[in-house]
Amino acid sequence: MLKDRMVRAKLRKSFREQRPISYVGKVTAFNDYWVVLAGKMVMVCRNQSKGVQVDAKPANYVIPRDGIESIAVLPDTFDINEIEVMTDGQQFKMIVKNGTDCFLGELGEG
């Protein structure tokens, strides 16, 4: 279903002080328990000038399905090397050309 699609997977927060984390990339494997993604991690951080920290190099991530809060399907043309983030009021959003912008977290989090 999601295999070979570009997605943004936002993880659940286990406790209030936890930083919001999302993974952006191509799904390489998908089953009832795991999602395997080849992409980059995006984390909301107060100490960063842009408000978010993006991995410099792509990597493979194995994410448990019950740890995922939401999955947004991105256009196949989305380039993970050109991730742009904007602020919309109190929210950090990832800019998606030819698609809907994705929520990453809020200003006070992280």
Name each region found by the language model.
Residues M1-G110:
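Conserved RNA-binding domains used in RNP assembly and mRNA/RNA metabolism
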